[in-house]
């Protein structure tokens, strides 16, 4: 009885104290924060890149680190390079099957699943890096991407970009479209389809396989990303002619896919952490490529004697015609590909009008003014 009276009295006194504090305009101390769930998750992030590879590999590492740190360790992401869990071209299937929770690659590697997936990576004469981000994030691209990947139990995010790529490495000069006939070139996606239209053989292979394929003669030409990555792979040791511009990948989007069941099982705040980490890397990687490509190009030319060449206009015109044919055929593909193609090309038409005045207009003017001053 005494104990019950004591508890009742204490409760009455506490209530009176709180009431008095409120009457005096004072607030009681806030209640203690609820205990954070002890649940800890560990995800595996597999990539299509060699371990520590600059730009692509280090970008994936940044995503893993950002998620781990931003989640306070509630979601720890461990990185695995190509070959550790799945080969470079096996990332999609491995994540879909649950062998890993995340994958870092490029969506045009999976065009065998759906031609629509090309549009989320690179399309010949397509969108620049900034335009691709605008279409995906604000032009309906993400919704189409979600629809396509959901069929395989996946969700994906833009998680990097290499910017405008170089046209490729060749063992001889490419003076006419006839010079493409008979060459064997590493080029994935719709760019590879275009090469086949002009008489070349196009192959898709992981980055770590390219140098050996050039040495062995399996291929005699290749493209990869740009000077920074191409220098790291050492292509200049086998081939000397380096062509621009890269018609096939004007802004190559890099993706971070996630197993949808694993993603949906996360609480809302951790889903946001994953999405934010990917969006941050989409900007960081592009800035890094823009910073490092210029210096690497100078090294290739001045130190290694690489011969820089521009594709002749008639070559580009022939490649553009072949690209139009390849893209036009997508109108007759499956419903998702057709809708993605239309969304992408409609956005491109609008983007061209603005880019001609904005980015292209400024860059042309800057070049003229700086030349006039020199």
Give a label for each model feature.
Residues 2-132, 142, 147-374:
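N-terminal secretory/targeting leader peptides
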Residues 137-140:
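Core domains of carbohydrate- and sulfate-ester-processing enzymes
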């Amino acid at each position: 009885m005494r104990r019950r009276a004591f508890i009742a009295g204490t409760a009455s006194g506490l209530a009176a104290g709180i009431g008095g504090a409120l009457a005096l305009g004072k607030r009681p101390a806030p209640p203690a924060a609820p205990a954070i769930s002890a649940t800890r998750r560990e995800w595996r992030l597999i990539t299509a890149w060699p371990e520590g590879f600059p730009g692509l590999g280090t970008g994936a590492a940044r995503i893993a680190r950002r998620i781990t740190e931003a989640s306070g360790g509630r979601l720890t992401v461990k990185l695995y390079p190509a070959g550790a869990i799945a080969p470079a071209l096996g990332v999609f299937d491995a994540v879909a099957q649950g062998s890993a929770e995340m994958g870092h690659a490029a969506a045009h590697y999976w065009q065998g699943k759906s031609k629509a997936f090309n549009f989320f990576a690179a399309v010949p004469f397509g969108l620049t890096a900034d335009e691709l981000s605008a279409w995906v994030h604000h032009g309906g691209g993400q919704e189409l991407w979600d629809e396509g990947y959901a069929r395989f139990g996946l969700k994906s995010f833009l998680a990097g970009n290499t910017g405008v790529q170089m046209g490729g490495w060749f063992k001889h000069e490419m003076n006419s479209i006839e010079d493409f006939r008979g060459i064997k070139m590493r080029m994935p996606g719709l760019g590879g389809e275009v090469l086949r239209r002009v008489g070349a053989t196009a192959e898709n292979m992981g980055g770590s396989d390219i140098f050996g394929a050039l040495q062995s003669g399996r291929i005699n030409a290749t493209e990869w990303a740009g000077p920074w990555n191409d220098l790291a792979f050492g292509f200049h040791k086998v081939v000397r002619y380096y062509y621009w511009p890269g018609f096939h990948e004007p802004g190559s989007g890099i993706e971070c896919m996630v197993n949808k069941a694993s993603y949906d099982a996360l609480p809302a705040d951790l889903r946001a952490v994953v999405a934010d980490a990917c969006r941050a890397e989409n900007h960081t990687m592009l800035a890094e490529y823009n910073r490092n490509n210029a210096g690497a190009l100078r090294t290739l030319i001045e130190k290694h004697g690489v011969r820089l060449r521009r594709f002749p206009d008639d070559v580009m015109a022939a490649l553009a015609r072949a690209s139009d044919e390849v893209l036009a055929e997508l109108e007759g593909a499956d419903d998702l590909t057709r809708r993605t193609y239309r969304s992408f090309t409609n956005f491109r038409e609008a983007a061209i009008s603005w880019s001609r005045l904005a980015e292209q207009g400024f860059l042309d003017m800057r070049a003229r003014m700086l030349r006039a001053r020199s």
